[in-house]
Amino acid sequence: RVTLRCTADLQGAMRERFGTTPVFLPEEDGSFHFDVPICVSDQFYGWVCGFGGKIEVVAPPEVRQGIREMTARLAEQHQ
C-alpha cells in the first residue's frame, strides 16, 4: 500500500483510476490524501511523475526513496 497526496484538481482523475473504494481525506490546503494498494514498479514511478509534481508519495519510505532515485537518474541523464 502507498499513501498519495494529490492537488485538489486531481480528484476526478484519481476517482477514475482507483474508483470509489479509497477514502479521500482532505488537507487544509485543499489537497487530499488516500491509501491505495499499488504494485510498485518503474511504471508506477513514471505514472506519478507524469502528473508534474501534483502527486506526492507520502508513504512508505522505501517508495519515497524509489521516486527520489528515479528522478535523480533522470536529472543526471538530462544534464
Predicted regions span which residues?
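Polybasic (Lys/Arg-rich)
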Residues: R1-Q79
